[in-house]
Amino acid sequence: MAKKKRTPQEQSADPAAQEMIIRAEELGIGTAFTRADEMPPCNIGGAGMCCKICGMGPCRLTKEGQTGVCGATIDTIQARNLTRAIAAGAAAHSDHGRDMAFTLKAAANGEAEGYYIRDVAKLRNVASYYDIEIEGRSPEEIADELADLYIAQFGQQKGEIIPAIRAPEKRKKIWKEQGVWPRGIDRETVEALHRTHVGDDQDAEHILQHAVKTALADGWGGSMIATDVSDILFGTPAPILGQANLGVLKEDMVNVVVHGHEPTLSQMIVAASQDPEIIEYAKKAGAKGVQLSGICCTANEILMRQGIPAAGNFLHQELSILTGAVEAMVVDVQCIMQALVGLAENFHTKIITTSPKVKIKGATHIEFDEHKALTIAKQILKESIDNYKNRGKTQIPSDKEDLIPGFSHEYINYMLGGSYRSSFRPLNDAVMSGRIRGVAAIVGCNNPRTQQDWLHTYVTRELLKQDVLVVETGCGAIASAKLGYLLGEAGLDKVGPGLKEVCEAIGIPPVLHMGSCVDNTRILTVLTQVVEEGGLGDDIDQVPAVGLAPEWMSEKALAIATYCVASGAYVIFGGASPVSGMPDRMSDSDIVLKHISEGWEEIYGGKLEFIPDPDEMIKATLEHIDKKRADLGLPEYDPDRFGESGDARMLELEELPLSERREAIYGVAAD
């Protein structure tokens, strides 16, 4: 039986989304929100109790002591299902890293049209990690050798993947002792599938040990490679002004929405859209020009580097088409709904697929090739412009918010100390003193089974009140952007007194936008630098920090969570657990759930837990942060200790007569 249909307000916390959901209902068009209401999740598969890896099944285990046809127990089945999901997520992000490495190779050899090395400093810095000779060599020579090194990590069969040497020393020792330092990125993913094939690995803890190894191959391998190469080719992000939400679409311009995850495509479309040839072509079609905007992680990529506006996050992909104002949605890989083509048939929008890995029946396919990138980008834009004349009635929401994205770990290092003394020391000192209680990384997807954006923004808002500095990536970052949390002055009246002092003194927003979902490796880099700076322990598991994915839905999220746990982080997911079982009926169904929490914590110092209630999620976050503070011997968090200093306080003091100012500052009267 379908559950009760939700109102637009219950389906999304975003007014722009609500407006488009109402329009969809008026037009009789279904969306992910209505499909989620009409299609209740399978309670057996959703709890990880269904096995379908062979032709003897599918086997559903719903009773105490029940096994599959082959004799597989519930813990074996759940461990296999979870590991396969982690392998799929790791494959998706790591394959993206592979493509980026090949693009770097082509650019270094002058074989990639329109691409060149934008950040030579980042190139030299990354190369130095791996003892690649940089003195007396051109950027292209360095990039060519770095690309070869990175490409080799995917097919390597023995040894250790090299990007992981950048982890803290104590963490690397744990990985070696546990035998989970990945040998090669592809090898671990292949072995994960082999181990979970019927008749293979049947010990849940042993299976999950390899899940960790597979995830690490992504986080400290493929994803880290992707972020490094993106910065080298397109520039390391620094703060820039942007906008977010459906109101960024323009009535008098050709609207092209790019959606997916590959910056090689989106960055080139940005370049092509600014070409005088394309601008003139759009004007001849009756438009003022081309308005680019992004959806999902592609949005974050072009937002944080060029300031191109974000039309929204994952659940906005259908809603943007519902405006009737989008000439083309250009997609590549990951998080792309097959429903887009059917939806677009109700309007004039063209769905253009571009990746050799992704085709959607009914979509226009223009395959992207980095060797002819600019030419193909212009072809895509011209096809979009040609569609402008077919536009019908439009309804573009007015909602949009300014934001400041682009806080790479390099920029955070710079902003804390400036050009001559860049350092994480001020951040560490702020945590040690208690001005910053701890750090929360709030990341991940939207899920139409929850109220879109609400969990992201509620958790963010409540943690800010408790002096927790928040860093965000992916769709979670766009959720906060749509509410204006990513501006320097935004919400400081609702931020705890200590965090407010830090934000005012440095000139940063209380929520730092750190990029796309693949850029979660930037957070690992920040945590590593925090450890290396000193004062907050000698490994990541000692830092007062928590990772949260309140609205997760993707296998990639499970891979990210696992490599963060293996790096020492406490990770909390909202929503349903994929390995929950039915503990009220099956006492052996929580073995896997306990192992990824208590078992992994004992081994790695990090743990993964699923907490659907947002208030319990916040409580668990603060308890963990406070425990880590106590373990480090730091002062107990006390919000009353702060709030009377910082730039705002100095401005207040300047208004006082000189005789009163000294007494206010030093507590003694003037002579």
What residue ranges belong to the model's regions?
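Anaerobic metallocofactor- and corrinoid-dependent redox/one-carbon enzyme cores
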Residues: 2-671
